[in-house]
């Protein structure tokens, strides 16, 4: 959309929008790409799946946007939406954990950092868990772990494949050992899913780090990733200081992991649904109408 077209569209409102520095920041009508500094009209960016049309940078998107990209229209049925975290340790740093929970819930409209449910992709069933980085950095606490475990168990019971969209800074430190045990719990549920020869795919988005990477994010039959996603366990600076070596510029990117065999395929956001449908079909997943006959 050109400037002339934009002003024509906005003339009745007589409003000049500010430029946001990030696609998920504020409500400015214009957004500056954090990679190439190209300024884009926010509506155009949204219509392009929040991907910069100039350099292809994939901006963060929330769980609702992700579900709309993956699932057939009106097919997503959410489960366990009322599960909400508590503060079992009475944890407090500069602020209490309880206050941080309330703030994140108010800011995102979510109870915790993952949305789970069943949907269809081109009429084929798929169990889906989508982590949302807006909620305390997508950190994995007891509720996140419980919801992911429950959707895996449901997928195992109903013989459905599962996709987990990973976007996380790792285990939630405010819950201590309770958060760390989610790594084993989810991994155990995935083992039972695998024993039934069912398909599990993690989609690694920016960022996927810490305990999430060290557990279910790397246990897939087919590991997908978005372009240039940050994927790793410890931070780059920590590794460099420990090894006393300079790491490659593209270290811990999706492309680096693909080159070294830790990721199977990098999928652009616009191609995600088509790619998932092909994978499901290749693995013999039947359409819901066919499966019920």
From Swiss-Prot:
This is Acetyl-coenzyme A carboxylase carboxyl transferase subunit beta. Signal peptide: none annotated. Keywords: ATP-binding, Cytoplasm, Fatty acid biosynthesis, Fatty acid metabolism, Lipid biosynthesis, Lipid metabolism, Metal-binding, Nucleotide-binding, Transferase, Zinc, Zinc-finger. GO terms for cellular component: acetyl-CoA carboxylase complex. Its main location: cytoplasm. It comes from the Bacteria. Binds 1 zinc ion per subunit. Its EC number is 2.1.3.15. InterPro entries: AcCoA_carboxyl_beta, Acetyl_CoA_COase_Trfase_b_su, ClpP/crotonase-like_dom_sf, COA_CT_N, Znf-ACC. GO terms for molecular function: acetyl-CoA carboxylase activity; ATP binding; carboxyl- or carbamoyltransferase activity; zinc ion binding. A zinc finger (C4-type) spans 33-55. Zn(2+) binds at residues 33, 36, 52, 55. One of its GO terms (biological process) is malonyl-CoA biosynthetic process. It comes from Prochlorococcus marinus (strain MIT 9301). It catalyses: N(6)-carboxybiotinyl-L-lysyl-[protein] + acetyl-CoA = N(6)-biotinyl-L-lysyl-[protein] + malonyl-CoA. It is found in: Cytoplasm. The keyword Lipid metabolism applies. Pathway: Lipid metabolism; malonyl-CoA biosynthesis; malonyl-CoA from acetyl-CoA: step 1/1. The keyword Transferase applies. Component of the acetyl coenzyme A carboxylase (ACC) complex. Biotin carboxylase (BC) catalyzes the carboxylation of biotin on its carrier protein (BCCP) and then the CO(2) group is transferred by the transcarboxylase to acetyl-CoA to form malonyl-CoA. Belongs to the AccD/PCCB family.
